[in-house]
Amino acid sequence: MTQHNNGAFPEGFLWGAATAAYQVEGAASEDGRKDSIWDTFSRVPGAVVNAENGDVACDHYHRHGEDVALMKSLNLASYRFSTSWARIRPDGGAVNPAGLDFYSRLTDNLLGAGIKPWLTLYHWDLPQALQDAGGWANRDTAYRFAEYALSVHDVLGDRVQAWTTLNEPWCSAYLGYASGEHAPGLQDRSLAVAANHHLLLAHGLAAQELKARDSALEVGLTLNFTVADPADQDNPEDVDAARRIDGQFNRIFADPVFHGAYPADVLADLAPYGLEHHIGEDDLSIISTPIDFLGVNYYHGEAVTKTPPAQALSTAAPAARPTASPYPAADGVYSVPRGLPVTNMGWEIQPEGLHRLLLRLQQDYTGPAGVPLYITENGAAFDDDVVVDGIVQDQDRLEFIEAHLGAVQDAVADGVDVRGYFAWSLMDNFEWAWGYAKRFGIVHVDYQSLVRTPKASARWFAEAARTNALPQRASGEAPDVVSSMQ
């Protein structure tokens, strides 16, 4: 890994960690909260590994004071969390003041600790009542989302500066409506492309409303990205396979937001599923409302081919319920293992992919728009089975984060405007269809006692945040930065 400027990051670089409401909060039936699509989906036989759910999760709802103190001890400058639509507007309609009060207390605790709240309005927990009316396949949900956004701003707008509308709408649309591996568990490609468009419309409507309320707010969007490479660059079919995955994963969201249009090739690919029929007269001008930042979630890239046998593209959890491809127009496209190390999710570890992605985003999207980038999620699941003196020695996760932060440094040195990095995740939590089988946290959670214990990666990350630089260490050694946390 190339290091620039003695491992230092730009002045003001934001160090944080991220979670999501359903994954950490628990308190699923308290203070007026009602079912989200994930509560419902978790009850479907075979949908989630071990039939687990977020009823208790990490109990962040009751332990957020302890958790904020932990964040402060880790030198975090920002905490990226999501508000639960099912807690704030439980039926999709009337506001539940008790639900908003939780986020008000959390925000006050964060500000009291000197930690910037980084709020995400939607991280996949649509109220079940709205799903019963069609969910994201129903255009009306976009307008209900804008109303929900304003109800959150009513209470938190005086204290929260950074507002993210959606987290990873690709997952909401295509894992939720095409593959069926996420809530609401549908497998209908036409519904998936409808959800895609309505999610983007929801983003644009909420961004417009929030900026109309307060033009000084930082309003942005978080997208997950892949880097799709043809397995054989000299094979036109493999080149087309990479184009299809890039189009249906990356460009289908980034192009409307930054260019005000869907890519022509993607529209052609998806023509059988009717994407164009959902685009209203003013929709693309709403969707391309200027934003103040782009959040980038990156975990891995992939080499793709149209030559079987190879691996299926989806790495769905081994739940009993059958799933389908999340790509409406990539039948016959496969993933090709490249011999790279992999995480416990089976995802290849490819930090140079993040470097390439950031260069591309700066060149094609954010640079021309004058919009900064933040890494809003990056991290890895590993076994965490090496424990010394009660501390998880997660050297593999530490090295994963270190390598990807190095890729960020390389991108910054190449002129990319990256202003912060949020580790995924602050703590082990409910990993969607995987249940509690996969641990992404830099803090270990004992799911019986709910005790939190910082892992070696957390201690290393705390030192990086304190010094605004990559800590120097001997190869194979985790740094002893306990003193900096006391």
Please describe what each predicted stretch is.
Residues 12-14, 61, 78:
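A common structural microfeature
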Residues 60-69, 90, 99:
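Internal amphipathic alpha-helical repeat/solenoid segments
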Residues 2-48, 72, 90-93, 100-486:
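Active-site region of glycoside hydrolase catalytic domains
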Residues 63-84, 289, 293, 364:
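Catalytic domains of carbohydrate-active enzymes, especially glycoside hydrolases
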